From Swiss-Prot:
SUPFAM superfamilies linked: Prokaryotic lipoproteins and lipoprotein localization factors
Protein name: Outer-membrane lipoprotein LolB
Membrane protein topology class: Lipid-anchor
GO BP term, example: protein transport
NCBIfam families assigned to the protein according to its UniProt record, in alphabetical order: lolB
Signal peptide positions on this chain: 1-21
Subcellular location: Cell outer membrane
Similarity remark: Belongs to the LolB family.
Gene: lolB
Function: Plays a critical role in the incorporation of lipoproteins in the outer membrane after they are released by the LolA protein.
GO cellular component, one term: cell outer membrane
Organism: Escherichia coli O6:K15:H31 (strain 536 / UPEC)
Length: 207
């Protein structure tokens, strides 16, 4: 089955705006101990969320390709989530729906793909090795399986270092949205060698 062509969503007119919106500023101030009760409480508050959704700007940059898009991420239950990517003109490029044991992806031509591994499928179909399984935790400001991380002066994640399957990801958080409780990440950047993934969250709805 031919793979979908994502070239046309690269370098569209709003791409420069997306990159500007995704710039990351490292939080200032001394870091806090990962053993602090405030950090444990923050993690518990985030894990207690049953449903959440966020939307914003997405950028993937490597030597091979550059992709800029809008994204919508929604989780409706344990291991049940939806990821939507649209180009800067508003057209849907990719829709991924995941539930336990079944993942479906629909491309811009309406072609449907199924798998039991969302991370592997999105990598093969788009050429973007997005660490989706870990990103589901990182986007919430949780370390997931990572044990090497730092906190900011408000007992929230500021940086993660994580190695898996030959990838060495570094995640830097540029700020948090304090209008939601608990506070949720406002922007973040993932890097692995020459690859960069930037996310800027416009807003969060949490339950």
């Amino acid at each position: 089955m031919p793979l979908p062509d994502f070239r046309f969503i690269r370098l569209l007119p709003l791409a420069a705006l997306v990159l500007t919106a995704c710039s990351v500023t490292t939080p200032k101030g001394p870091g806090k101990s990962p053993d602090s009760p405030q950090w444990r409480q923050h993690q518990q508050d985030v894990r207690n969320l049953n449903q959440y959704q966020t939307r914003g700007a997405f950028a993937y940059i490597s030597d091979q390709q550059k992709v800029y898009a809008r994204f919508f991420w929604q989780q409706t239950g344990q291991d049940r989530y939806r990821l939507l990517l649209t180009n800067p003109l508003g057209s849907t490029e990719l829709e991924l729906n995941a539930q336990p044991g079944n993942v479906q992806l629909v491309d811009n031509k309406g072609q449907r793909y199924t798998s039991d591994d969302a991370e592997e499928m999105i990598g093969k179909l788009t050429g973007m090795p997005i660490p989706l399984n870990s990103l589901r935790q990182w986007i919430l400001g949780l370390p997931g399986d990572a044990t090497d991380y730092k906190l900011d002066d408000q007992y929230r994640l500021s940086e993660i270092t994580y190695s898996q399957n030959g990838k060495n990801w570094k995640v830097v958080y540029g700020g948090y949205d304090t209008k939601t409780q608990p506070a949720m990440p406002a922007n973040m950047e993932l890097t692995d060698g020459g690859q960069r993934i930037k996310l800027k969250m416009d807003n969060w709805i949490v339950k």
